[in-house]
Amino acid sequence: MHDLMMTAVQGDADAAYQLGYLYETGDGVPQDEKEALRWYSMGAQKGHSKAQFNLAVMLEEGRGQVTDLRKAFFWYEKAAQQGESNAQYNLALFCTLGKGCEVDLVLAHMWFSLAARKGSSDAIHNRDAVAKQLKAEQLALSQQWVAQWIEKNAVAKS
């Protein structure tokens, strides 16, 4: 445990994520949501997508601190941009409901579409429900954004 903490303090994002998870679940350490939040935050700031997602969930649910939907939106977006499908789904919900942001059904459709690519039946259902509320040009814009996101991320991975 000491080695993991030292590695995290030295800037290792994965070690910080692992510590956040241990403190969140109480696996081998006393459960402590404030500590989990602290370690997830450290990992998130270093770009660890799972730390970003878990931090967003805790911020959304008010675990370890007061609920902060704007910050939750921010971290869901960071994780979603890295391809975390659960973050893409949650971000789409935020855009649909106006949680931590203005309602934006075009953006919601885009994120539901990306999450649906991983086979999420909820994402598929919600994408289709949102599509029914969009005008043809809005749907085309969302589909254009999806294609651009896929292309950008394919280039980034190569």
Where are these regions (language model features)?
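N-terminal segments that cap or nucleate solenoid repeat domains
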Residues: 1-25
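Short helix-capping/linker turns of helical repeat alpha-solenoids
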Residues: 9-13, 25-27, 32, 45-49, ...
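Hydrophobic face of amphipathic alpha-helices that form TPR/SEL1-like repeat modules
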Residues: 18-25, 29, 54-61, 65, ...
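Terminal, low-structured helical/coil segments at or just beyond the last alpha-helical repeat
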Residues: 121-158
